[in-house]
Amino acid sequence: MTDAEKINALICAKSADTIALSEKIWNFAEPNWREAQSAKAMSDALCAEGFAIEHMPCGMQTAFVASFTSGTGGPVIVYVGEYDALSGLSQEAGMPQHLPLADEKYGHGCGHNLLGAGSFAAAVALKDYAVETGLPLTVKCFGCPAEEDGGGKVFFARGGYFNDADAVFAWHPGSANLVSGQGCLAISGVLYTFKGRTAHAACTPFAGRSALDAAE
């Protein structure tokens, strides 16, 4: 059995847990920064798999970091799992056409219930593979709020949570199973301060330095 076949078998072995988690998040349908039940469901599922849980990283109430280490000296692999529902995208489950729920404002019509569940499946499968094979590594799964209209990943980046990662994986459901070749725009803000040097414009203009020159 190849490594890929082994990992596929490990994913299939936990498929019922993955589906159950996805359905829970679907039914919770919580908007960005208010995904309390979704975050708890995902962190509880990872805790049951032996992951240590850090709650509220960077002060985000609906975020967590789940970590599992096998051996010593291995790489750090991070999976980003998100679970925010979106406004105007409620949907009756199991229906191929758009059937919004009359009493629901938010929903997972964009498949964000799968974002967290899929990352859960990947993190657990890699953890199980490391345990079975003795592969040294650390697996982390970030429970990340506000995939849209908020940017939970920005807070993780600003807090240094990606600094020790050797690889970071995120995904989004779509019409095909592929690796995206598209680039993504960052939304991290950076503040620069440019300082000049004052001088008399008539007598000693050569002694001055314009901060605008650097800014331009």
Where are these regions (language model features)?
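Acidic/His- and Gly-rich active-site-bordering loop/insert found
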Residues: 3-108, 113, 117-120, 124-137
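Metal-dependent amide/peptide-bond hydrolase catalytic core
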Residues: 1, 48, 212, 216
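Histidine/acidic-residue-rich, glycine-tolerant segments that coordinate divalent metal ions
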Residues: 86-88, 96-107, 113-114, 129-216
